Amino acid sequence: MGLVSGEVGSRAWAKREQVLAGARRAFLREGFAATSTDAIAAEAKVSKRTLYSYYPGKEELFADVLRRLTIENPQTQVLASVEEMEPMGLAELREALVVLATKVVSTMMDPDYLALLRTIIADTHRFPQLGEIYRSTVPERGFRVFLNLMERMRDRGTVDVPDAEAATRLFFGPIVTYTLLDGLFKPGEQPHPPAPEKIEHIVDLYMKAIA
């Protein structure tokens, strides 16, 4: 019985991944507004009934595509890496933040992610919920997890951050400037992420601010 249940679960997971991959291709090609559930089903090579068995609508699909590209990306595992951080001192914290910043930059400079950001900007005036989908799916979750890390480090006496929210914004701010100036606002060009040594310099400046 357990084997059968496992096989069914594996097939369901594979089918969901198939739907998600089709949705990603459709959204990247047509944007959010112009993509219908019919188009997504056709791209994923599934019936609409199958699509709706996993997702009630294209908003939920779009959110899942964003999640998979960013904080739940199986290659970078950005969210999980922050949740699992338990540095024992400033040296370990610096090392962990360099790794994290590198992952965040890699994720936010991904061409597909930048293309979806442009879609959100272009379509939000017609679909105001897109902005909220993005906020709640990506930045707010990542922000909250990092803020919790700063609070833990402060409570242990590892860092001196009276305002954990400000410390969180201070960490992500420089990274976002690369996303905007060297990625999002250069359509048609390859994104230019900062060099590894530049990321280390950013983290070193950050460490001086919180130590």
Residue ranges and their predicted role:
Residues 1-30, 34-46, 53-63:
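Basic, helix-initiating cap at the start of DNA-binding domains
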Residues 15, 58, 69, 97-100, ...:
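Hydrophobic/aromatic residues within well-ordered alpha-helical segments
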Residues 32-33, 130, 159:
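Conserved hydrophobic residue
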Residues 77-113, 167-168:
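Hydrophobic alpha-helical connector segments
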Residues 95, 106-121, 128-155:
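Amphipathic alpha-helical packing segments from all-alpha helical-bundle domains
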Residues 154-204:
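Hydrophobic/aromatic-rich alpha-helical bundle segments in the mid-to-C-terminal region
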